[in-house]
Amino acid sequence: MAAPPQLRALLVVVNALLRKRRYHAALAVLKGFRNGAVYGAKIRAPHALVMTFLFRNGSLQEKLWAILQATYIHSWNLARFVFTYKGLRALQSYIQGKTYPAHAFLAAFLGGILVFGENNNINSQINMYLLSRVLFALSRLAVEKGYIPEPRWDPFPLLTAVVWGLVLWLFEYHRSTLQPSLQSSMTYLYEDSNVWHDISDFLVYNKSRPSN
């Protein structure tokens, strides 16, 4: 079925507008908002689904609501951050006539405070995800720039051993310092595996189902 003439005419106008270079910076900000919303939903929904049904108690309705709420918050925050970051970058470029490396840091710095500055579980997870990658990247950058010598042997096995040693030590003796979702995961792995009553909660279920 062909589209109505009015709709086809509108699409022609919209597509012509999207191709105009003079509006590219503003339109890039809008598409960044769109991409942030989509990406946030795509990565949060599966994570929330798994974590909620593995570790959260409550009715099916409560679990579904928790999944939707977490997905919405992540999607909305990421969309706002991309919008803010790209908008500030465009403004900096317009004011100064070109871009500088400091522009990226300043725009993201302000966006981070405005969007991800609230201390909650979702923002904590996002920040910790980024922090690990930032530290890796800075280590590689320091080697590339010659600030530190390139290792003569692969340091990854030692790093792995230290990370796993520390996280299990923290879990066993200073658990409250770990992020809640990590506590839940490690409890499932290392403590729930110590308890069973029969074959049902040894192989089929993690914990015995309550009898009716």
Curated annotation (Swiss-Prot):
Compartment annotation: Peroxisome membrane
Transmembrane segments annotated in the record for this chain: 97-117, 153-173
Membrane topology designation: Multi-pass membrane protein
Domain of life: Eukaryota
Entry keyword set: Glycoprotein, Membrane, Peroxisome, Transmembrane, Transmembrane helix
UniProt-listed InterPro entries: Pmp4
Expression tissues: Expressed in normal prostate epithelial cells, and androgen-sensitive prostate adenocarcinoma cells. Not expressed in androgen-insensitive prostate adenocarcinoma cells.
Predominant cellular place of this UniProt entry's protein: membrane
Subunit relationships: Interacts with PEX19.
PANTHER family (UniProt xref): PEROXISOMAL MEMBRANE PROTEIN 4
Protein's recorded name: Peroxisomal membrane protein 4
Species: Homo sapiens
Organism placement in taxonomy: Eukaryota, Metazoa, Chordata, Craniata, Vertebrata
